[in-house]
Amino acid sequence: MANHSQLGFQDASSPIMEELVEFHDHALMVALAICSLVLYLLTLMLMEKLSSNTVDAQEVELIWTILPAIVLVLLALPSLQILYMMDEIDEPDLTLKAIGHQWYWTYEYTDFKDLSFDSYMTPTTDLPLGHFRLLEVDHRIVIPMESPIRVIITADDVLHSWAVPALGVKTDAIPGRLNQTSFITTRPGVFYGQCSEICGANHSYMPIVVESTPLKHFEAWSSLLSS
């Protein structure tokens, strides 16, 4: 999760998030190159090494037409690739349904007969020492590590949004409509998210907690809750 005064992304814990971080760095390098070029040209103008009386420069016009096109291609190609990856739904090992309410989440493990629960934020007065304020819940989502997970997302009342930054996931929860997303966790851990669509007075009290565990631990947990 994010640390105090952190300026960058959270540690990537899924292949999609790793791609997003790489694309962010790539876009920043392109922006840095553009800013450097503009600064260089401004410096030349201020030092009067470039004439402001030029009325015709076919070569310059050709350059400032081709160069932006190249920049756009450099940004568009990796962006389109990531968009395709984010929309692609692999054959999942586990399907989870998330239903947004004012102001809590309901989760249903559709591959199991009787495995569903409501997930409420843990009140500050009940937080154990060392836990995170406004981010902990009474029931976490538990998923197997390194397994394709599909999440079907909807809402029961108003618009919500199911978002977990470390996994690179953010999908709107819309009443009467099913949206879906997928991800794979690359390491064990606990990943925090929140509802990312303003949904009323207690919008900030809808945390999401995903716990990624080895398969045998997930099987033990699911057997315990199903029994």
UniProtKB/Swiss-Prot annotation:
It is found in: Mitochondrion inner membrane. Its EC number is 7.1.1.9. GO terms for biological process: ATP synthesis coupled electron transport; respiratory electron transport chain; response to oxidative stress. It comes from the Eukaryota. It holds the Pfam family COX2_TM. Cu cation A1 binds at H160, C195, C199, M206. It is an enzyme of class 7 (translocase). GO terms for molecular function: copper ion binding; cytochrome-c oxidase activity. Keywords: Copper, Electron transport, Magnesium, Membrane, Metal-binding, Mitochondrion, Mitochondrion inner membrane, Respiratory chain, Translocase, Transmembrane, Transmembrane helix, Transport. It catalyses: 4 Fe(II)-[cytochrome c] + O2 + 8 H(+)(in) = 4 Fe(III)-[cytochrome c] + 2 H2O + 4 H(+)(out). It is a multi-pass membrane protein. Residues 46-58 are mitochondrial matrix. InterPro entries: CcO_II, CcO_II-like_C, CcO_II_C, Copper_CuA, Cupredoxin, Cyt_c_oxidase_su2, Cyt_c_oxidase_su2_TM_dom, Cyt_c_oxidase_su2_TM_sf. GO terms for cellular component: mitochondrial inner membrane; mitochondrion; respiratory chain complex IV. The chain crosses the membrane at residues 15-45, 59-86. The keyword NADP does not apply. Cu cation A2 binds at C195, E197, C199, H203. Mg(2+) binds at E197. SUPFAM superfamilies: Cupredoxins, Cytochrome c oxidase subunit II-like, transmembrane region. The keyword Ribosomal protein does not apply. Binds a dinuclear copper A center per subunit. Its cofactor is Cu cation. Component of the cytochrome c oxidase, the last enzyme in the mitochondrial electron transport chain which drives oxidative phosphorylation. The respiratory chain contains 3 multisubunit complexes succinate dehydrogenase (complex II, CII), ubiquinol-cytochrome c oxidoreductase (cytochrome b-c1 complex, complex III, CIII) and cytochrome c oxidase (complex IV, CIV), that cooperate to transfer electrons derived from NADH and succinate to molecular oxygen, creating an electrochemical gradient over the inner membrane that drives transmembrane transport and the ATP synthase. Component of the cytochrome c oxidase (complex IV, CIV), a multisubunit enzyme composed of 14 subunits. The complex is composed of a catalytic core of 3 subunits MT-CO1, MT-CO2 and MT-CO3, encoded in the mitochondrial DNA, and 11 supernumerary subunits COX4I, COX5A, COX5B, COX6A, COX6B, COX6C, COX7A, COX7B, COX7C, COX8 and NDUFA4, which are encoded in the nuclear genome. Belongs to the cytochrome c oxidase subunit 2 family. This is Cytochrome c oxidase subunit 2. It comes from Gallus gallus. The gene is MT-CO2.
